[in-house]
């Protein structure tokens, strides 16, 4: 049996257990309780303390951003497949990356790699506007439809290559990249305000999450962490090293 099949079997078993237990009067209440536990045990207990981030993670219904047959696994701390060879990041990493942007509220943030739209939704609970680009058109369309349905009118999704950024909407207070790149794309730095941060997984034999702050002199590295992301596609693969 392959891994994908086992994941789906586990999801079905957990879903049956979840909705047959006597402690929850409805499916949404059950998901609310699982989300509370996720935030407490997987996020808060591991050092994510920014109140804006905690509140955002409590509000966004992660189970709606995964395939229906995987909703029983939505609140465990693991990435999950969302189709097209892509994944939704584990909740802790989403919270950590969001906290690493140093958001205060009211910002304009650019995201590379919309995927399911979950990271964009978390950001949208905090900032003024999220601009997000997805290289796979089917995912971009699906994410925009879901975000619209959930009332996230402050998220704009575009299908395209995130390497180029979104110059018409720049400059940005923060940039977040949800796929591993061999280097930081120049256009993303050009479109980032001085004082803003970029959070990006970099692959160079292995992957590490890097958090940089843009200064008048260049970039200041603030933080690194070993991670594992799907690779960033498109022009970044043949771009020159900065």
What would you call each of these model-derived segments?
Residues 102-219:
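Conserved nucleotide-cofactor-binding alpha/beta core module
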Residues 9-21:
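Bacterial N-terminal signal peptides
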